[in-house]
Amino acid sequence: MSLILRLASASLLVLMSGCANVSYYLQSVSGQLDIWRRERPVEGVIADPATSAALKQKLATVVRIRDFASRDLGLPDNRSYRSYADLERPFVVWNVFAAPEFSVQPVRWCFLFAGCVSYRGYFAKTDADRFAAELSGQGYEIHVGGVPAYSTLGYFADPVLNTFIHYPNAEIARLIFHELAHQVVYTRDDTVFNESFAVAVEIEGVKRWLARTGDERGRADFERRQRIRDEFTRLIEKHRERLEALYRTRIAPDAMRSCKAQILGELEQEYRALKQGWDGFTGYDRWFAHKPNNAQLASIAIYTQMVPAFQALLARERHELGRFYKAVRELARLPMEERTAALRALVPPSRTPE
């Protein structure tokens, strides 16, 4: 798609959005245009004598990962992740999450094509921080998190970015598989469904990628990282459920605040004990740098709540990805309550997410 056509398409998003949220859409369009301005075909970057040997090697690996994604995983065969852009910043967007003082359910915002989602993304951290401050002033608990990649859901070709090209190869594969999965199935107004599906695809995809490449060191590192991720997720979910149960009670606000503080304090204590078994890995310390709150816990649950259900569905479909995608598309057509109930029915009660 030419830059002029892209500009026209992006401008159309603003015109169709009406008066509400115009400033937000304008920053979105500006950020997207900046990415397009910077992107170059991967082959051209590899052939450029000015490109470092390390980047050339990483991009060559990306080419293999991208081909594998479509050939072996049935993910879309299009121009996404066939170009590269250096944004000269650590994240492509910063997502703002918010939740009330006594709820672990995130605030949702609704957009033209994406529908209603549980976060709001900004291309500039200053804009994200400004919006977060506004929400905080309204009494919400907030969390601002940097994001290395995002999907335009197939409307445009998403590039490889400097924000994640330095990751270990398995993590690059994980991210590309995740974002391409959003182009396979995406249902409006159900962030947990969309993200949990993409996480299930990324995990299965990386396992198959590592098996195909025979990278034993990469496989061991991936399994270690996945174990740590799973342990962290279970810890967060445990205390999120405790808070959810607390907020359902009718105790006085002051008493509820006291109980909430105790639960969050125990979360921090258990994290410090848990990471002792992680061989020096401290990747989640930054998450605990500020006192955890409802918005932070919600930001994790969005991506993990229904992953076991999707993995059970994949197993039911004999790990045949074509059948799995078809089953997920059928679920996506159901009303949200029916869809959620069908997913919950796939896992034993002890593993069913709250």
Where does each model-flagged region fall?
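Metalloprotease/metallohydrolase-associated module, dominated by Zn2+-dependent proteases
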Residues: 21-23, 35-45, 103, 170, ...
